[in-house]
């Protein structure tokens, strides 16, 4: 008998809660995503997260301890060697990743691009982080005239290749991306995803076509999601969750356009009758505010998210469990534009917790979440992680 019929897991992408013990190895001493945002905002207004116990993990400006938190609270330390989205999420679902995925804020190394040019017979232009629409405005015409390939990246571990469909036929573009995928399996380049980005149109009016193709990496082992799906439980992936796991262990995928759309979809799943896991990633914190080093925007986004939580609380059933966490930090006050190696918060709440919650022991790996989900549904336990299911008292 499952303790909880439905588990709703929410990952606030990049919402770290202070430097991890190994932060110095990552160049992240002093990083503190929520703490620094709270200082910048002269106090964060997150009353619903506070009720759950956020300030009991650690007091920050505007975020105080409460006498009787509604839920259980602690923080988690990442065990894997990376601080990227895929590593964090894969660890949450029970894997340990010892090869970090690389990000390329300065563009890709010359030796990689030289090899790609040699193997494809086409010149490469671009080679920088950019938005897909902006890079087409800037380089689309040159690409058409020269037959070169526009290579660009983002704040995530991706290598994207754009070409006009009438200049580089789709079949050729897909072959080129397969070559790039092979080359970037090398540990020194380890890229999470290669994406074909075909476009059409004329200068000043380029549009990306639906013929995008992703060459992702499947998780390096079976995750708790695979075990759930194989045991006929529902695994509803909201936002970029399905992409992060390359569809592995997913029974239904709901795309989102923004954090608020993500919260809408979460409310939709709360209205659904299912047994299993609903897994939401809220990416805006990271993509729009963390990497762009925008503490004001980040703080406002956190407050907007918090304001949506009463809708979630109102729809939770007695046999539901809500888990809120993050996958890494991305301190908008920290130098650079990269993620930061931090502890992440963990809040656990169910309406069945009539006495409220208390502090859980510090979690030594994000995989404790996967272990807890696995134990709840009686599926094979992951190799890594310790369940805290029995510590959650009704």
UniProtKB/Swiss-Prot annotation:
Bound cofactor: record note: Binds 2 manganese ions.
Name of the protein: Phosphopentomutase
Pfam family, one: Metalloenzyme
Gene assigned in the entry: deoB
Keywords carried by this UniProt record: Cytoplasm, Isomerase, Manganese, Metal-binding
Protein source organism: Bacillus cereus (strain G9842)
GO cellular component terms, A-Z: cytosol
Family affiliation: Belongs to the phosphopentomutase family.
Pathway involvement of the protein, from the record: Carbohydrate degradation; 2-deoxy-D-ribose 1-phosphate degradation; D-glyceraldehyde 3-phosphate and acetaldehyde from 2-deoxy-alpha-D-ribose 1-phosphate: step 1/2
Needed co-factor(s): Mn(2+)
Enzyme's top EC category: isomerase
Top-level taxon: Bacteria
